[in-house]
Amino acid sequence: YHGDVASGRYFSRMLGRYMAASAHFRDVGMVIPVPLHWRRRWKRGYNQAEIIAAEIARELGAEMRCDLLARVRSTGTQTKMSVDEKSANVKGAFEVRDRKKLQELTEVGHILLLDDVFTTGNTLFACFQALRIVFPPSVRISVVTLGFVDGA
């Protein structure tokens, strides 16, 4: 937050250690961070979800993949939007980059989809829908965030 990458890494490692100790996450084979649109990434210089995902993947012994999911439409900031506006804002904003490549990865039994903050769940749900098109129901997709905004 505000460029404090060290704190983000620290809290991400703590969450990753907690998750690694849980039977619910021991079988995670891949961690996928929610992508930023390329313009926002360029402006900010980094994707905080990737930083969090890297630490959690390391603690879980899982592979982190930033190349599989893309934000194909700039959605703008959602901080002042209503729940319905947020839902409409992210609908169709995410796509699988290379379906063939992803289909080759279907031996992964459990994917962890990660975002930095959870408000309404619309962003994570839009990403989940994009991944579910490619991955069969036998592949479990869990979600995790480092933060939660109440009353969004």
Regions found by a protein language model. Give the residues of each.
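Conserved PRPP/pyrophosphate-binding segment of the phosphoribosyltransferase/PRPP-pathway fold
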Residues: Y1-L113, T120-A152
